[in-house]
Amino acid sequence: MKTCITKGIVTVSLTAILLSCSSTWAAGKGGVGLAATRLVYSEGEEQISLGVRNTSPDVPYLIQSWVMTPDNKKSADFIITPPLFVLNPANENLLRIMYIGAPLAKDRETLFFTSVRAVPSTTKREEGNTLKIATQSVIKLFWRPKGLAYPLGEAPAKLRCTSSADMVTVSNPTPYFITLTDLKIGGKLVKNQMISPFDKYQFSLPKGAKNSSVTYRTINDYGAETPQLNCKS
């Protein structure tokens, strides 16, 4: 399930609602969708691409894109082309993303975010009294160095869990960012969580938990859930 943060934006002739959320290719009956829920930029690649589709039959959208750091600042280490363009009804386009920054960590992934804002056009007739919805889709972008000891597919099984009193600690000894989903502690579902490389996260023991056993799934490079695993100590 995706979570959206809603902000009100007021302009001279238009009141819009900006929705910031993760996006999938599907955009309902009309709107803008992305072809992926996450991106992986492998070291050595000249560029990667992201598809953007306008499923509306009659509304053009102004598309603006950029890359952000985890602290929500625009990154100057990436170029996206085209950075600004009009996406006509029932059309799609490719965003090309190129890394131009300094060398990054060689022993682990580095996290960025790709942001795509879609603003629907307004006709002269509509100006001043029309509510328009502008969507801002934000997806994770992982920069992945060459030569990591094992592929991402082997990483989920390497997580380790320890418990003490009313806390459970999940440790990630791998060089990958691992997103836990369908996460259960003592049989009780808890909030999804992403754990950074070589880091750990502490969970409070849920109310009614039978024990401190942990089961989980993770998200692969294609945005799909992996099979359920039991966390080892």
UniProtKB/Swiss-Prot annotation:
GO CC annotation: outer membrane-bounded periplasmic space
Domain of life: Bacteria
GO terms of biological process kind: cell wall organization; chaperone-mediated protein folding
Keyword Transport: no
InterPro entries reported for this sequence: Ig-like_fold, PapD-like_sf, Periplasmic_pilus_chap, Pili_assmbl_chap_C_dom_sf, Pili_assmbl_chaperone_bac, Pili_assmbl_chaperone_C, Pili_assmbl_chaperone_CS, Pili_assmbl_chaperone_N
Signal peptide, first to last residue: 1-26
Keyword Coiled coil annotated: no
Localization, UniProt: Periplasm
Coiled-coil blocks: none
Alphabetically ordered keywords of this record: Chaperone, Fimbrium biogenesis, Periplasm, Signal
Main location: periplasm
Cited Pfam families: PapD_C (PF02753), PapD_N (PF00345)
Induction cue: Induced in the presence of epithelial cells.
UniProt cross-references to Gene3D superfamilies, sorted A to Z: Immunoglobulins
Described purpose of this protein according to its UniProt entry: Part of the elfADCG fimbrial operon, which could be required for adherence to host epithelial cells. Could be required for the biogenesis of the ElfA fimbriae.
Family: Belongs to the periplasmic pilus chaperone family.
PANTHER family with a match to the protein in the record: FIMBRIAL CHAPERONE PROTEIN ELFD-RELATED (PTHR30251:SF0), PILUS ASSEMBLY CHAPERONE (PTHR30251)
Protein name: Probable fimbrial chaperone protein ElfD
